[in-house]
Amino acid sequence: MRNIVYFILTLFSLTGYALETINIEHGRVDPTPIAVNKFNADSSNNDLVGNAVVKVISNDLKISGLFRPISSASFIEEQTGINYKPLFAAWRQINASLLVNGEVQTLESGKLKISFILWDTFLEKQLIGALFEVPTKLWRRAAHKIADKIYEKITGDPGYFDTKIVYVSESTALPKIKRIALMDYDGANNKYLTNGKSLVLTPRFAHSADKIFYVSYATKSRALVYEKDLKTGKESVVGDFVGISFAPRFSPDGKKAVMSIAKNGSTHIYEIDLATKQLNKLTDGFGINTSPSYSPDGKKIVYNSDKNGVPQLYIMNSDGSDVRRISFGGGSYASPSWSPRGDYIAFTKITRHDGEKIFNIGIMKAYPQDHENSERIITSGYLVESPCWSPNGRVIMFSKGWPSRAKAPGKNKIFTIDLTGHNEREVITPAGASDPEWSDVLN
């Protein structure tokens, strides 16, 4: 995916300026008003590309919940492009704290050069500028890259817009057909990776975003783990693991993977060396141990286990030693997912109210004090589950289900929410959707 060339672009001095950043951990924040101006273009075709780039940048920033793009209908200044200093008073008049100017040009190579500058309209300073050289078909990724740069400059955290989501697509009509699908983080460029002839579950990205793994049931009793190369489309069977029901999760270095396998009435966590295919059993005793997830440094594994009666969350060293419980609230816990930052673990929690099951998505500290209940529920519903993290550890994606009504089957959709429990949004997909997995930022 190394098709984007990136350059820093500085036209005006930044000397002596320090920007106050947004910290979303402080709770709900007022979105920063930003004007994304029309991009200059060297042709009518590139004018259309520029308009599309502006739309993607604005949408990315709006989706984050931290920015409020201002409608172009209120713009006063008509000058566009990156080779002039804006009339800042005109932008302040429409309450734009930030201004984005840009341009799109075609190079002799046939590639597009997409440039931008981000301005602070009150201090009248350039904050950042950059240009991207991309094949024409990758203009959308360049727009995501620009939004990433803006997000990082203002928040201090890396952006997450130039990413992919792999998930299970579900037809809404009966009988339900499930297929592995891939899309941009915002739902664009959706494509199907499997044909729907077999039951498929739990797609996972490998060490990079170039490959995925998933479970497919060739028969009702036989599950196979498949590897699919997203560049070539080539697919191969990784293993025929009797008793496996979820795809493996991979270590940060890509050399190992963990999975749960049921044998002899118990389900245990196993680690596999991907080079030698050697399996190492990490848990013991009786009970069901499932949903392992590595810490960002690969030294720890979080998982859920019912060995003490009710499913709770536990952390152990990656060799299976030093097991300790980290969940202490009421209810049962499932599907833990370790934040890429290493500070939090997301989870599904099932509680009961008036005899009805309630599903919750929550987060807790990865390293709480002894018996500290550090968890915080951020959303609840009829069936919310399968949390996963954005690569910057600031947003959680999950699936939400609705029950069947009359002759209409139930449906599942994918949503995002920030770690404070605000800004819940649906990710639009062509059909039902569940089991999302978020890629790292693309190269």
UniProtKB/Swiss-Prot annotation:
It holds the Pfam family PD40. One of its GO terms (cellular component) is periplasmic space. Residues 1-18 form the signal peptide. The keyword Transport does not apply. GO terms for biological process: cell division; protein import. The Tol-Pal system is composed of five core proteins: the inner membrane proteins TolA, TolQ and TolR, the periplasmic protein TolB and the outer membrane protein Pal. They form a network linking the inner and outer membranes and the peptidoglycan layer. Part of the Tol-Pal system, which plays a role in outer membrane invagination during cell division and is important for maintaining outer membrane integrity. This is Tol-Pal system protein TolB. It comes from Rickettsia typhi (strain ATCC VR-144 / Wilmington). The gene is tolB.
